[in-house]
Amino acid sequence: MKPSTEWWRYLAPLAVIAIIALIPVPAGLESHTWLYFAVFTGVIVGLILEPVPGAVVAMVGISIIAILSPWLLFSPEQLAQPGFKFTAKSLSWAVSGFSNSVIWLIFAAFMFGTGYEKTGLGRRIALILVKKMGHRTLFLGYAVMFSELILAPVTPSNSARGAGIIYPIIRNLPPLYQSQPNDSSSRSIGSYIMWMGIVADCVTSAIFLTAMAPNLLLIGLMKSASHATLSWGDWFLGMLPLSILLVLLVPWLAYVLYPPVLKSGDQVPRWAETELQAMGPLCSREKRMLGLMVGALVLWIFGGDYIDAAMVGYSVVALMLLLRIISWDDIVSNKAAWNVFFWLASLITLATGLNNTGFISWFGKLLAGSLSGYSPTMVMVALIVVFYLLRYFFASATAYTSALAPMMIAAALAMPEIPLPVFCLMVGAAIGLGSILTPYATGPSPIYYGSGYLPTADYWRLGAIFGLIFLVLLVITGLLWMPVVLL
């Protein structure tokens, strides 16, 4: 049990619920809608403070709403309908998130990541890139970026990708050149490599729909509010110019703005070659894994008219089991996958209720009224900038997305002139790219920050510089390119 001083984390969400519930119902809302919003806000506060795991917070919120559904979920008119059974309807709502295709897509992607890890293919790819490109420090930065880029489409946990696969490899590189943490020698090469590790993780998290769990949460929120969605291919094509630009620009930019003292050397390639020799030649399991991943990516990009992305993932997982790339025990024991599965499904359920009770449409109209007189483009850019900068106040991408994305979507829906697919993709890209702003913004951030190679002042300074560059490029490509491929 946590110390008694931590009890405020438990009480704060309840206090928020009580305070909002006691506020008079705003004009235009029904009482059950306002009470639902009170519980929803309490859940968001719980996700931020985390007195218990996020999935538990969301499940408790759903339980409260479902049990009290005659007062929180359904209107008097609905309850008065002949044959309306609120017990059955509330249960149907409570588990509705688990039938959302987004949930199964991310679960499948987690299994892909397990396959990469179990076969060693992810580590082998990173080592090959380091071996081939590690003779010059700048090229080593590109090797880190390309390693993240290859792993990102099938690793929906950026923490598992950045902190679990890439960081354990690159943390071995600086000492090869006597670049030590918490020492004046850290700037020799270690600082550049570690900054490239975290910035590459943030960039690749924005490039692919399946590179980060909050991306899929956003699509689930979008679908529940508007019945519109973005496919894997839509996201990839919409991000393509920005992706190419960032992948090519960022290693060089880091090299210029945070220059390493050591520009070249042979120790890193020799170390990578030794590690690869220890792994042995490419085995049959790795070859099968590679073939399935290429097939999945091809279908995700080009097969949207013939097969749903979630069905692609589901089928590939079945093949991975049949081909013994992973075992059934690997699936049932994957705590990270099941954790995300439950909290993501629960949050989508809660967002669906927010829309069903009429809160989203009411809030959208309220925003539209206050924003009338401004051009849709100006409003869209302003909303993206505000959403992006609010990242400073959140230490969890999940809480950040859950708290702010529904409001952003509501604002866009209230102004038909704003193209929803374009706006939502810009919001999605901002989730990943904005994670560079602080040393607490996303899972891998504290790992790289705590490596001893990135002093506090350097991290905040570089985060602000790269964050501003990312935001400017996102707005430009969002206005010029995304409408071409998404509308």
Curated annotation (Swiss-Prot):
Membrane topology classification: Multi-pass membrane protein
GO molecular function: antiporter activity
Coiled coil: none
Protein name (Swiss-Prot/TrEMBL): L-tartrate/succinate antiporter
Transmembrane in keyword set: yes
Pfam families named among the record's database cross-references: Na_sulph_symp
InterPro entries: CitT-rel, SLC13A/DASS
Lineage: Bacteria, Pseudomonadati, Pseudomonadota, Gammaproteobacteria, Enterobacterales
Sequence similarity: Belongs to the SLC13A/DASS transporter (TC 2.A.47) family. DIT1 subfamily.
Organism: Escherichia coli O157:H7
TM regions (residue ranges): 10-30, 33-53, 54-74, 93-113, 137-157, 189-209, 236-256, 292-312, 313-333, 340-360, 370-390, 393-413, 418-438, 465-485
Key words of the record: Antiport, Cell inner membrane, Cell membrane, Membrane, Transmembrane, Transmembrane helix, Transport
Gene name, Swiss-Prot/TrEMBL: ttdT
Subcellular location, record wording: Cell inner membrane
CC per GO annotation: plasma membrane
Catalysed reactions, as listed in the record: (2R,3R)-tartrate(out) + succinate(in) = (2R,3R)-tartrate(in) + succinate(out)
Functional summary from the UniProt entry: Catalyzes the uptake of tartrate in exchange for intracellular succinate. Essential for anaerobic L-tartrate fermentation.
